[in-house]
């Protein structure tokens, strides 16, 4: 039998050996029919059985979120021109009056925003692929935007406000030419320069009293939106050294007014200067030469040179005692502030108040001019105490109401902290120089 197998071709012998091995494996290792019919091979309906799956073969998406399709908008920005209404602007943007009507009739906020447009305001229009208005935006401030969105029921609106935080900043300067230039050099805005002058305007005449070498320091707020500075806030503490005298002003958060370290009001009953600080032609001098006659004539007041038409302010609350004209004073206004004080304003271009009228401190009572006996346009200002002429720059002025009681205690504690911060910032600045 073996000799017969050996006489077979080589390929046949290999195939016979392979098939024989398969048959032997099947006999000894595969289950028989009885094993297949055993209960553990059967599955009951409704029963859960553990199943092992290869994680590589089965993929399970992790919380897949299907977002609604977003609408890509084409944005166009339009700036309101002088004298342009919402209707004209919408027409320029290619929108019909019907769209404007739909917007303004949707709610009062939309109507108010579109009816109060001012020159240089910007409107942003968002159009879809069919050129239909989907969204409208109006920037109210760097941190607030009015947003209108089309919905199934018409237009809806909301005020999108960004969170505003505050940080402190510091500035200082020494005056070398004039106060305004010193403020600019210190990095202050025009509003801050004016605010600083207003804070100390009851103690310092910024038109006459400023000298080379005067200096100031201030601590002020900066508005922060999304990490960027978008504007300036209040000045919270400041010092001003004028001709060797130091003045201090600190903001009271409750009243919004400024006081010194002891809670005394910076505001006085009278302003030192009845107009914006400008170049002046003469100081208080009771024995000056008259500009026309050349004779010695008492010059019981102060002359302020400024552009014709500059607003002139009432130095304090009072009643207009006289508003008239004569060949010497030109247009003039006298104001009685009490039985003690009278202020006079001469050579006005225009008088804006009448005799008997009540006026408030800072109210415009006229404009600077050159009427009457003058060599050039200017304001002549006089300050009388019990009928006697006083230098308005140096006369002691009555104070406005100061803080008392608990309000004073709270303010003094806060004032101490703010002045300490002011000094720390000053020291840090010098340490880094």
From Swiss-Prot:
Topology of the protein relative to the lipid bilayer: Single-pass membrane protein
Task: Tell me the cofactor note.
Answer: Binds 1 zinc ion per subunit.
Under which pathway is this protein filed? Cell wall degradation; peptidoglycan degradation
Q: What class of enzyme is it?
A: hydrolase
**Gene coding for it:** shyC
InterPro entries the record matches: Cell_wall_metabolism_enzyme, Csd3_N2, Dup_hybrid_motif, OapA_N, Peptidase_M23
| Activity control, per UniProt | Reduced activity in 0.5 mM EDTA and a complete loss of activity at higher EDTA concentrations.
Gene3D superfamilies attached here? 3.10.450.350, Glucose Permease (Domain IIA) (2.70.70.10)
The UniProt similarity line reads: Belongs to the peptidase M23B family.
One GO cellular component term of this record is: plasma membrane
| Keyword Transmembrane helix found | yes
Record-listed Zn(2+) binding positions? 299, 303, 380
Effect of inactivating the gene: Grows as wild-type in LB medium. Synthetically lethal with shyA. ShyC shyB double deletion mutant has no growth or shape defect in LB medium.
What subcellular locations does the record give? Cell inner membrane
Chief localization = membrane
Described purpose of this protein according to its UniProt entry = Cell wall peptidoglycan (PG) DD-endopeptidase. Hydrolyzes peptide cross-links which covalently connect adjacent PG strands probably to allow insertion of new glycans and thus cell wall expansion. Degrades purified whole PG sacculi in vitro.
- Designated name of the protein: Peptidoglycan DD-endopeptidase ShyC
Which E.C. number(s) belong to this protein? 3.4.24.-
Question: What PANTHER family does the entry give?
Answer: CELL DIVISION PROTEIN YTFB (PTHR21666:SF288), PEPTIDASE-RELATED (PTHR21666)
